[in-house]
C-alpha cells in the first residue's frame, strides 16, 4: 500500500480542486492511501476508508515570504504534509502551494542527500517523439555552479530511469548552441564535467542542446539552471495555450470552418491532448531524503490528480532509493568536481 500526504489547502483553488482530485485518484488506485492535511472543516469534503485526516491550523499562501512560511507558520498544511514523510508515515508529499516555501520547508525537514548541495525541481515536457523530455532545474536554483548542473544530471538520470524504465537515459546540457565553445563559463565548465562523467560511465551525455531540442526529443533529460528552466517551462505553456486559442478562434469563424472543425475533431483532439500541460503536472523535488512533488498552483482537478499519480509512481518504483544509489555511485566524480578550484 502506497501512502501519500496531500496538502489540501495549497494552490490557487485549495480544497475545491484537491479533494475532487483525491477522490478520482482513489477510484483509480485501489492500493493507495491518502493522508489529507488541512483545515478541519475543509477536510470533511472527502471521507473514505483509505483516507486519514490530519488537521493543520495554518495555510502557506502564494504571497508568503519563505521566512514566514518556514519560521512562523509551523502548523501549516504544507509543513505538516511534509512532516508525514519525515516521520515515515507517508511515502511522498504533494502540494500545489508556494514553490519557494515548499522547497525551503522540504529542505529543512528532510535534508539533502549526501553529495547533493541543492535540490532541483524536475518535470516533463511533451516532445515530437510522442513521449516527454525531463527538464531540471525549473526554478529552485536561479544561480547554479557547474557542479550543481552535474548533480542535476545525475539525479535526473535516476528520475528518468523510473519514468521511462531506461537504464541509460540520454542527458543534454541546455546552451545557446551545440558547439562546446558556446555558452558562459559555468556552462563550459559544466560541459567538461559532464563529458568526464560520460567517460567514467556515470552518465550518458549527448552534449550541448538548444531550446528546440526539448520539444524535438533529442535527449531524455535537459539540464539547466532554474532561471532558464522556469522561463522555458512558462514559455512552452504559453505557446500551447496560444495555439489552442488560435485553433478555436479560426474554426469558429463561420459555418464552413465549423464544419471543417467537426471533420478534423479526432485529429485536433489528439494533438491538443499531446500538448495539454495538465497531463505533465507534478514536478519532483530531487535531492532530498524523502519524496516531495509540486503541483502547478493553478492546477485543475485533472492536473492535480496527475501530480498524485506521479508521486504514487515514484514511490511504487522506489525513486528515492534509485536517486540515492545513482548519487552514491557518482560520489567520487561529484567530490572531485567540488574539489576543483572555481574558474
UniProtKB/Swiss-Prot annotation:
NCBIfam families according to UniProt: plsX
The protein, known as: Phosphate acyltransferase
Organism: Acidovorax ebreus (strain TPSY)
Entry EC no(s): 2.3.1.274
Lineage: Bacteria, Pseudomonadati, Pseudomonadota, Betaproteobacteria, Burkholderiales
Catalysed transformations (reactions): a fatty acyl-[ACP] + phosphate = an acyl phosphate + holo-[ACP]
Protein's job: Catalyzes the reversible formation of acyl-phosphate (acyl-PO(4)) from acyl-[acyl-carrier-protein] (acyl-ACP). This enzyme utilizes acyl-ACP as fatty acyl donor, but not acyl-CoA.
GO molecular function: phosphate:acyl-[acyl carrier protein] acyltransferase activity
Family of the protein in this entry: Belongs to the PlsX family.
HAMAP family attached to this UniProt entry: PlsX
UniProt GO BP: fatty acid biosynthetic process; phospholipid biosynthetic process
PANTHER family the record matches: FATTY ACID/PHOSPHOLIPID SYNTHESIS PROTEIN PLSX, PHOSPHATE ACYLTRANSFERASE
A GO-annotated cellular component: cytoplasm
Pathway connected to this protein: Lipid metabolism; phospholipid metabolism
Domain of life: Bacteria
Keywords annotated in UniProt: Cytoplasm, Lipid biosynthesis, Lipid metabolism, Phospholipid biosynthesis, Phospholipid metabolism, Transferase
Record Gene3D superfamilies: Isopropylmalate Dehydrogenase
SUPFAM superfamilies, alphabetized: Isocitrate/Isopropylmalate dehydrogenase-like (SSF53659)
Subcellular location: Cytoplasm
Subunit structure, as described in the record: Homodimer. Probably interacts with PlsY.
